[in-house]
């Protein structure tokens, strides 16, 4: 009786015995110029084709906590997305691709008996980044208010959204992306919003929930 031997089994076995690391290489990943091209970590990628060194890093997104970049724990709720731009001598350089607030932070901002204000703003920075920004803020109890609830009526919410939108656009269009990001985590833009909106209704806990890059800089 003859036994048919599957020739594919031996080839599969040989493939399994190959060292996985032999098909990968370790590269260093650097933050964009916004953070002075600081080293943010290392990662394994597939070995590149010598004819096209950029093929293995095209469109790859790296998410990094701002706390790790700056070495300050108070910024652990902010995550940055960096997109791979080019690779040279096992060093990957990136560009800004967005910002998100952690889920835990967003949940901590939502309180009962208060009004949560959400604002969406579209604008273009001085150096050509077209951004979609999502901001949230919480109503704040006025000093002389005795009521337990701190609700904002519809007309006040519309006025607050207009005021916040105007502030963000005026700030954003006159800055490049580096200055605008620095303005965010220095909290100066939040302080400006709180002061200007207090004339309509007091707010606090102002935070940018998310930034999407709709169009990258062409400069």
From Swiss-Prot:
Q: Keywords of this protein's UniProt record, alphabetized?
A: Cytoplasm, Ribonucleoprotein, Ribosomal protein
In which broad location class does this protein mainly occur, judging by the first location in its UniProt entry?
Answer: cytoplasm
| Subunit structure, as described in the record | Component of the small ribosomal subunit. Mature ribosomes consist of a small (40S) and a large (60S) subunit. The 40S subunit contains about 33 different proteins and 1 molecule of RNA (18S). The 60S subunit contains about 49 different proteins and 3 molecules of RNA (25S, 5.8S and 5S).
Q: Which Pfam families match?
A: Ribosomal_S3Ae (PF01015)
**What is the protein name for this chain?**
Small ribosomal subunit protein eS1
What GO CC annotations are associated with the protein? cytosolic small ribosomal subunit
Q: Where in the cell is it found?
A: Cytoplasm
Q: Which GO terms describe its molecular function?
A: structural constituent of ribosome
Q: Please state which protein family the record places this protein in.
A: Belongs to the eukaryotic ribosomal protein eS1 family.
InterPro entries referenced in this protein's UniProt entry, alphabetically? Ribosomal_eS1, Ribosomal_eS1_euk
Mention one GO biological process in which this protein takes part, according to its record: translation
**Record flagged with keyword Metal-binding:** no
Output the SMART domains linked to this UniProt entry. Ribosomal_S3Ae
Q: Does the keyword Ribonucleoprotein apply?
A: yes
Question: What is the species of this protein?
Answer: Guillardia theta
């Amino acid at each position: 009786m003859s036994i048919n031997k599957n020739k594919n089994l031996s080839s599969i076995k040989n493939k399994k015995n190959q060292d996985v690391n032999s098909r990968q290489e370790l590269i260093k990943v650097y933050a964009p110029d916004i953070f002075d091209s600081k080293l943010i970590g290392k990662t394994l990628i597939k070995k590149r084709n010598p004819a096209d060194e950029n093929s293995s890093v095209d469109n790859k997104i790296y998410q990094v906590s701002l706390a790790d970049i700056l070495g300050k724990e108070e910024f652990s709720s902010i995550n940055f997305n960096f997109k791979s731009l080019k690779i040279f001598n096992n060093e990957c350089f990136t560009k800004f691709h967005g910002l998100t607030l952690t889920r835990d932070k967003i949940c901590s901002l939502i309180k009962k008996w208060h009004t949560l204000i959400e604002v969406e703003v579209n604008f273009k920075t001085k150096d050509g980044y077209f951004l979609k920004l999502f901001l949230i803020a919480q109503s704040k109890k006025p000093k002389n208010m005795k009521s337990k609830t701190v609700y904002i009526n519809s007309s006040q919410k519309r006025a607050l959204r207009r005021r916040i939108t105007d502030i963000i656009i005026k700030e954003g269009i006159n800055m490049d992306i580096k200055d605008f990001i620095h303005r965010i985590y220095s909290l100066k833009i939040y302080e400006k919003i709180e002061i200007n909106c207090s004339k309509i209704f007091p707010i606090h806990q102002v935070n940018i929930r998310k930034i999407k890059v709709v169009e990258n800089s062409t400069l």
